Amino acid sequence: MNFLSTAESRTAQAAASGTTLLPQFRAPSWQTGMHSSAATELFATGPLPSTGTLPPSLSAYQHPTTFSNRNFATTSPLVLQDSTFNTTSNGILSHHDPLLQIKTSQGTVPTALAFERLGSSVLSNSIPPQSSTYRSAQESAPHLLQPQFSLLPSALGGSQQTPQAYSSTLFTSSTASIERALLRECSVIKHHQRPSGTQSIQAQLTGSQHSLHSYLSNSSVVNFQETTRQSSLSCSPIGDSTQVSNGGLQQKTSQVSVELAQSYSSAIPSSGYPPSTTKIKSCSTEQPLTSTKTPKPQSIIPPVQTLSYSKPLHNQSSVISGQAQIYSTAQLPSLLSVSQSQNYGLVQPHNVPSIVHSQVYRSSKVEKLPPLYKTLTFSGSSQTVTPENQTLNYSSNQQEVLSSVTNENYPAQTRDLSSVSQSQSYSSGHSQGLSPVSQTQVSYSSQSQVLSVVSLSESYASGESLTLTAPSLSYSSASRAQNLPDSSPTQNYISMHSSQNVQTQESSSPQSQKFLPAVQSSSFASSTHCQTLQNNITSPDPKSYAERKLDSDVYPSSKQEDGFPMQELQVLQPQASLESSTQRLSDGEINAQESTYKVSKADDRYSQSVIRSNSRLEDQVIGVALQASKKEESVVGSVTQLNQQIGQVNNAATLDLKNSTNLIQTPQIRLNTKDLKQQHPLILKVHESKVQEQHDQIINASSQIQIPNHALGHGHQASLPNTQVLLDSACDLQILQQSILQAGLGQVKASLQAQRVQSPQQIVHPFLQMEGHVIQSNGDHSQQQLHPQNSEVMKMDLSESSKPLQQHLTTKGHFSETNQHDSKNQFVSLGSMCFPEAVLLSDERNILSNVDDILAATAAACGVTPTDFSKSTSNETMQAVEDGDSKSHFQQSLDVRHVTSDFNSMTATVGKPQNINDTSLNGNQVTVNLSPVPALQSKMTLDQQHIETPGQNIPTKVTSAVVGPSHEVQEQSSGPFKKQSATNLESEEDSEAPVDSTLNNNRNQEFVSSSRSISGENATSESEFTLGGDDSGVSMNPARSALALLAMAQSGDAVSVKIEEENQDLMHFNLQKKRAKGKGQVKEEDNSNQKQLKRPAQGKRQNPRGTDIYLPYTPPSSESCHDGYQHQEKMRQKIKEVEEKQPEVKTGFIASFLDFLKSGPKQQFSTLAVRMPNRTRRPGTQMVRTFCPPPLPKPSSTTPTPLVSETGGNSPSDKVDNELKNLEHLSSFSSDEDDPGYSQDAYKSVSTPLTTLDATSDKKKKTEALQVATTSPTANTTGTATTSSTTVGAVKQEPLHSTSYAVNILENISSSESSKPIELDGLPSDQFAKGQDTVAIEGFTDEEDTESGGEGQYRERDEFVVKIEDIETFKEALKTGKEPPAIWKVQKALLQKFVPEIRDGQREFAATNSYLGYFGDAKSKYKRIYVKFIENANKKEYVRVCSKKPRNKPSQTIRTVQAKPSSSSKTSDPLASKTTTTKAPSVKPKVKQPKVKAEPPPKKRKKWKEEFSSSQSDSSPEIHTSSSDDEEFEPPAPFVTRFLNTRAMKETFKSYMELLVSIALDPDTMQALEKSNDELLLPHMKKIDGMLNDNRKRLLLNLHLDQSFKNALESFPELTIITRDSKAKSGGTAISKIKMNGKAYNKKTLRTSKTTTKSAQEFAVDPEKIQLYSLYHSLHHYKYHVYLICKDEISSVQKKNEDLGQEEIVQLCMKNVKWVEDLFEKFGELLNHVQQKCS
């Protein structure tokens, strides 16, 4: 496939390389490699490209990346090919082309969407095992995802669409299975990031592309642009980078087109490797270079790729493998191509080489950790970059580099990198810096590279910066990290300097970064760059210490891969390459932070691709503010830069420290930091001088904040830094910058110092941050969106609290805010970005005129407030500098754990998206909801991590558990804070700041997580919830408890925390479900709970969350929770007011969509149990939301976990997937009903089905161990209080204790206090439908034509399918009455989802507007299931599953039912009976009105009947009409006219004629068709034959034929009538004779029989009946007569055209339309005559 695709793309590389290959490659390649994942990704990709002309190719390009990545995971060589193919042929795009086309109208949002989607694939790529899982999930949900993407994006449109698509994807995936959900979460995160990159690119590409282009046009303009975009995309794994590239490309359609084409071309020429080399030289000419260059590197690299590819992939196993895979397989070709290769040689040539390099490097570097680290980073990235840069700078250099790369000498490549670095002082240096970053950055590379290339290409200001960087790089050439930092600063600088250009690239890069981080979730090498690097390094490092990495990978592959492996990898990486790695980390960290920040900033536009779309305005506003702030910051710029440098250095040091938790490396890193400080000042100065104001300030503010953020971000928050930077950049950044300017200068240092203290965390964070960045990119997007949307509010808040914020940010803020942003951003942003944030924010921003209202509503509904709150909280938290410091110290440990857990959260990217959903629904609640998903992923990961990182991150373990709870608690308390802050950001923030500070202080004191809970309040709210959910199965309260636990665990409670974490994790699994459900509920909960909870729930909520859940661990948390609750209540009230004013916020499409999205993941647990009741739709989720936290308490933490798991949708099992999907559908169709306002009503209306669904799902979960939270074998959450009000309430919890708890969501408030077990007696009964022993599934049931019985009508034409993997579950569920998996109606290439419902105690399935693709490999994953249609109610079809396969044809009695006793009815009776005997189609020709309108075409059988009747008598239309009305089941003449007048009948007849012509040409045709069960022509032949036969039998009723006469009529094809004129004229009983002769023939083959024919025979007949005999004869021999006519036609055609093949003759005959139509008319006349005679 790859080869073909590659070859094809080569041929079609020019313009439609992507497009051409798309369709072809689509199904096989991505599907083979990772169909589900690929499909989803493709889908995502689809939307991205659709925005522009280029997008399709890009998409194709990207997808190849994705695909190759997956393929890689699947097959190393395949991946290599795929990667090559991807680069060249854009096979993935091919896959996605239709999707892309489908989403073409979506524009930017789709791009963002695609980006998200890509992110998904990136994540999945990054986690190969996950990738597989992801693939699996997407296998089940790819179609769903695709259609959903399609539907969601189109419905939402704009940025909202993106989030929707993302959420959809996320959720759909997530529904697939917990594991899948996890994978998908990661994927989603990546997707999420991808859109940011794309949007960023799109937004900035216009500017930056132009500068980029102008520069790149020299040699790599297109390349570079592509690089930028693709780099962005690259960051997310190949697919991602392509996507981002796409996004960028879309912006620059023509240029991008060229680039893309070139990219493809270059990729295409991969086989033409030598040319590519030569062309690489040509690379100076950007396009030629690209295409040529790419081919060469590709050719060269593919081998290496294959080799190293396989290795890295395999070695990297999950994270590294995923990353390597992504980078190597998908990313490298696509990513590098896009990102690095694109950068250079248009990434095409270089891309391939770059990609190849990256891949190769990855592979080889993966094998050789240091080389991979360097080469991968450098070689893949750097070299790619270098070649690109060189290409840009020097053709020859590039060639050299390419040669090296091509040579794929890892050393050589490394040398190349070094050489490039040196030879291309900045290009190379940047490249090198980039390189490390580059892979690090494949996101970064893409960023760095792009930056470097962009830098170079962008402006030599960048170049200067880069040059400086290059020197810096040279300085730190020993330590690539420094180069990276240089690169980063340059990058940042460039990004900022080129503002849009660079930012575009950077955005692209950041996205790449984000993606990379996501992709490289395994290692968050320094920041984005370092992270990517470290990821790469991790790839390489793990290769070096592959086992370590693999260990990491193993966990990563479980999802920890992202979280833990990153840390471990980070540790390993620094160890593996302490000098370069450490330096790289530190530099990379700085870079990453700067770059991350830049990226964040740039990503601010994109990074929140959704946010970008949504917050673009705000971003722009922020941009203005930022620029204003930048001006301020330019003053502070140096200081900030210095601080940043220091902070970065510290960060780098911390990064390393945190990364490896290696104090050993800390010194190195610190040395590096010093170096960095030394270098960085230069770099920063250069940056300052060039992009100083924009870039440095942003970098400074962002770097500073981000560094703190990174530090605070702990890996998870590492991405948060991006987010935070994004937030900062959008909102906070301005404020932060201002604050930094104001308090930042002094505090930056303080924060830097704090960072130093936190630096270990920060170092890890950067790594994690990288991934976090990716995730954060997603989260960041949302958060940034939130902030951008809240930017004004936040600005006010920040301005008000900017100093405290700055203080916090700088000191504690780094942790707090980072934590907030990280944890919140991570998840919120993902969630928000994915859908809620982007959609809600964007939508609300557009819809709501009041920003504050929007913020409040969004905060409450979308989690915007959480972000705002995050900021305000972080401000407050920052105010508590001491807190911040202590917190930061504490958080170092905590952060480390958080990194792990955060990373896990990140790993649970799906959770993040869910968080986003949750966030969009309810800042807090949504966050909490989201957290469960991460919890799911993270939970396992966390547990593994806890196990895995005990030595390294015992705190991490504790932190994970603690952080999880802390996050949850924080979110719970922060939710209110956030909401309140969102609502009263300006006024309340100050007041809240103290509260938050207090709360935060308490939390800080409680646990390092505390800071998280403060800043994490928002961040943790979402992110931390996720973390909390992830880390601690507990949803929110666990977070606080976790904080306390963390504190305790740090001392020695790690084990207990771990246990709790495990419980929490379990809970989180459940929570995920609930969260998924809760998402939808969040909004309603927001409204209804605002009302209900405000009074009872305030205390209860606070208590349950803070006290109940936290009490076990720390009362202080509960207090802060209380405050948070109060704030939340306020926010909720505000939101409620807003919603009341503007219902669309909560009820409109947004709410609906949010619900839908939420339902998709079904893994969100509400932050506040109180909110849980709101959404009936996803009881499980709501339940999770409500009481995941209470479960946190050690004793009941597991138990509550089942609460979360109550939905059972989170369970990895297919059933859970189905249930989640069902719930999702439920939510989707009930989302409007379940508005918070009338959640009770909604609950009543939906609760029964939901409860039944939940009950069934619970049962299934139990039986199938599908339970998510109850992942603990015994813990099966039977509580399926799916009632929106009692989401949590109805949850039956069979946690580890296996005790069933039912937390009544309705009693959420009270249940919040104490998850009261709700009686599930009623619910279960409601949830169970009457059992059905057997299910009619094709191949699983008897094929006898037995009547299936039961109500409903069986329609042969309507095909329903069920997933093969779900069949057993399905049967079991129907038997037990539980909720079965969904079934799907086949609609051409789509599957429409039908979700189970219970109506009148019967299990029925209702149509939804969720669709999956149904083509390629997907068709082999489903089996037909027989259903009967019950009714069409509320515009929904309801069907039931048959217990036995229904008869093909309706029973004769039905058919022969005579509507009227007219003559036609008489004839219709026989006809009907005859029809029955003949075939369903012919049998069913019911006598209907001959009117054309009589039967709607949908009912084919009716059509057939019409056909039949019309053919029977065309001449008696009126009679037919009258008779047909009543005689629907009779096959009387009436159909004929109507039927014959239908297009369907004409087509049928045409096919009939075609077959007869074929038979006339080749008598064996018929036998061959019958043997092969032809479905194209045979059915038409049978239909016509059936009609003829039915009419003939009708005539027989009127003709009492003598047997011998009958035999003669049927034997002889020729009939002559002999009459006596006199008698005939007189009309007497004249005796007429009929003479029959002719040669007998075989009725099947129509060949003349060889047997001697009897002599002609004559029969005397009644003259009045002669016509009937003649009609009977004509009907009987009609086929033969037409056959003879066909022979004549064929002979006439052959005379005119000799030497024609059969096909051509058939076509020529059929082209004679008049001939065919004449025959059709005669056929109609014949049937009409029959009808007339029989009527």
UniProtKB/Swiss-Prot annotation:
Compositional bias segments (type: Polar residues): 267-297, 971-985, 997-1024, 1449-1478
- Coiled-coil blocks: none
Residues with the Phosphothreonine modification: 949, 1341
Give the position(s) of the covalent cross-link described as Glycyl lysine isopeptide (Lys-Gly) (interchain with G-Cter in SUMO2).
1058, 1083
Subcellular location as annotated: Chromosome
Per the record, its GO cellular-component terms are:
chromosome
- Region Disordered: list its residue ranges: 267-301, 414-440, 479-518, 533-561, 964-1033, 1073-1132, 1178-1217, 1256-1286, 1441-1532
Protein purpose? Plays an essential role in the protection and maintenance of transcriptional and developmental programs. Protects many bivalent promoters and poised enhancers from hypermethylation, showing a marked preference for these regulatory elements over other types of promoters or enhancers. Mechanistically, cooperates with TET1 and binds to DNA in a common complex to inhibit the binding of DNMT3A/3B and therefore de novo methylation.
What name appears for this protein in its UniProt entry?
A: Glutamine and serine-rich protein 1
Q: Which organism is it from?
A: Homo sapiens
